[in-house]
Amino acid sequence: AGDHCKAASDLGLPFVAVGLMYHQGYFTQIIDEHAEQRVEFHPHRLDDLPITPAIGGDGRQVEIELAFPGRSVRVRVWQAMVGHLNLYLLDTDVPGNRDDDRAITYQLYGGDRTTRLTQEIVLGIGGVRVLRALGVAPSVWHINEGHAAFLVLERCREQVAHGRSFAAALEQVAAATLFTTHTPVPVSYTH
């Protein structure tokens, strides 16, 4: 998605992006003495990254809560600049969260199906709620790959809560949503 951000910045488009704050970043692939692939993650120190707390209207770092079965997960938000545009990064490594919930945003492509699904809920539903908390009201929403698809359901939920039928909400949300994929092969599909 970085290329979308860079291009939008270069073109001067009014654009904001939301992603996950992966504390261990991308992995390094190592081939060991048995010609087997090993994956090594290298934790980031937040102080070393070009990010700052995303500050809300109350002057404090934006933090939201997401309901999961039997628990609530706190998500705090960081801000990075990509050219002239804001990139908001969602982070579950928050004191008070369970250890497994703190790890939701540790690794890109890490974990099992449950971890991936949980990351997608944080990104999709959490992303909408974060933009609302920041006072950002996009006229068009773009989903790059299926990882943020839960934003469609969250936006429909908002409209139904305001009295629209689900069918009307879905129609309006669909009309203001774009989807792109950079890996159009079955192996890349999220199920």
Task: Give residue spans per PLM region.
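An acidic- and aromatic-residue-enriched active-site/binding cleft used to recognize and process polar
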Residues: 13, 18-25, 31-32, 93, ...
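A conserved hydrophobic secondary-structure block that centers on an alpha-helix together
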Residues: 1-11, 17-18, 110-139, 143
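Active-site and adjacent substrate-binding regions of carbohydrate-active enzymes
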Residues: 128-136, 150-160
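Active-site proximal beta-strand in glycosyltransferases
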Residues: 90, 160-183
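Conserved small/polar residues in nucleotide/adenosyl-binding loops
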Residues: 190-191
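Acidic, Ser/Thr-rich peripheral helices and adjacent loops at domain boundaries
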Residues: 29-55
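Active-site cores of enzymes that catalyze phosphoryl transfer or operate on phosphate-rich substrates
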Residues: 58-129, 180
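Generic recognition of stable, solvent-exposed alpha-helical segments in well-folded globular domains
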Residues: 3, 85, 118-126, 143-154, ...
